[in-house]
Amino acid sequence: MKLVSSTYVTPSLIAKHLNEQLEKHEFSGAMVFVSADIEYEVLLPLLSLECPYIGSTVLTAQHGVDNAFSTCVVVIFGKEHEPVVGEMRDIAKISNGTTFAFSTSDPEIADYCKISAFSGGLAADNWAFERMAVFLNGNIIESGTVGLHIKSGNETTFDCGWETIPGTRARVTKS
């Protein structure tokens, strides 16, 4: 397996570059959600983020520390790999096949996981990341702070995993 990037995805790093792309300066954090069914080579240039968001289908950014997730800006990569920007409150307009995750405090997360084609992702109750969860195939797996670790096998397959960093309680991988 070739190591594509061992750099940790940090909310502040993604927010910094998203602010530049959207010409905004109030975003405090971001999350990466992973889907193994989309080739990362196609996704890399979409937002030109200088961080390893390889394999992402959804990237969210929230302004403010304690704002509800309904105020998030959502960037969704559809079948044509074109990014669409909207707000998470418009989630009802998103296809059931969209890879997505809600905050761990969202009461509808269990119902959503049942209807979504969900691979995996990270979610937290707020951008202070006081309570974080890892999702894998619709299941909630509690964890601490995690980083996204990407390995590439060949042109059509790759391994996406969550590599623990100091203070974590779990390690989850998806291949």
For each predicted feature, which ranges?
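Cofactor- and metal-binding active-site motifs of prokaryotic enzymes
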Residues: 1-175
